[in-house]
Amino acid sequence: MKWKWKPNWKEMRRWKKVALIAVSLFILFQIPFIYRRIRLGNLRAAIQKVNAERVVDESASAYTDYKGVVHVHSSLGGHSTGNFVDIIQAANRNGLNFVVMTEHTSDVMDTSEMTLKGVHAGVLFVGGNEVNTASHDRLLLAPGSAEAATANTVGTQQVLANQKARGSLSFIAYPHEFTSWDLSDYDGMEVYNLYTNTKKINYFVTFFDSLWSYRSYADLMFARFYERPNDELKKWDELIAAKNRKVVAIAGNDAHANVGFQLGDRTGKRLIGVHLDPYERTFSVVRNHVLIEKEKPLASETLLAGLASGHCYIAFDLFGDSTGFTFSAENSQGRKIMGDEIELLDGVRLIITIPVQARVLLIKDGQVISDENGASRKEFPVAERGVYRVEVYLTQLGTLVKDKPWIISNPIYVR
């Protein structure tokens, strides 16, 4: 005789009813997150397809494309738990060519001098600082200096002047907080900051996403909250127009490796814990690609010169390797690249090459003047002076990222 359990709802105790309803609702609640996990799997497959389709003719350019990250902190300046070994290993595993450290300052030591510098494991490191000025502005200084520790006692204008006198670079950090827009001695600005973007995370939704997706797709969960930095890009376009001069755009990884929890011994050895923003993951999301003439080596001087000139572009390489992207201009006298000025003369031809077919936006003085999909090379005749830049989108990756930039170029200034 077989015994079968036939639950009788009327005879079931109240707590069992509540428990059964709760379990049923919980299971139903998971369905959207299971679907979201499937979509991340599809995104991974689409990214792999994009990378497999890449075509790059390195001989067609007089420049070498070096990729790296800017705005990185270690435990040296506080606000971070990361150490030098973590950073070096993360950079190496990501295949980076350079890392610009931006240590917070200290009253007892020159953190720009004490941080990573030179070449480690094949990666070039530049020692810099992030500072808060007495004007309540924040700047990235590269290279940094011992003087950076006093930045909070003087105004932004003095900090910028001191940096320029040393022949060093200054970039506006967190432009949504910056107030000294009347000044002009900065070299550029962060038009994208990863930490700022993470503030848009819905932590309730992300918690349940993590239950299903974190183990397999922790990096691609970024696609859920990544947004085009509309306000920063608009401010950048307006700034160039108002100042009538070059303003270089960079992306800040703002890597701290300080999100998560752990239990460990007094030596710092972790016994158990979860690390939500390891350097290796942060370095994979967004990079700055700097173009350096092929006959010149990658060194601190050539890297900083490339950044200062705007010979660089921002790429969200998490969605596909952008190496090989070029944006140049030709007139009857020669060729220039992004960051350069070129005379209109009898006309200019803008040339865009991309490693894969993509959607290409050509933007003049902040306004889109061309929007074409499915192109890997585009040429545009130009008959008007203006500031021209490019945004590239990978529409083939699907709805999660198709409307979010893959590449943001620096401008070509047609004079």
Each model region followed by its residue ranges:
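A metal-dependent hydrolase metal-coordination microenvironment
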Residues: 40-213, 226-236, 242, 247, ...
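General secondary-structure edge motif
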Residues: 67-71, 216-219, 270, 287, ...
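C-terminal functional module detector
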Residues: 2-45, 50-62, 243-249, 253-415
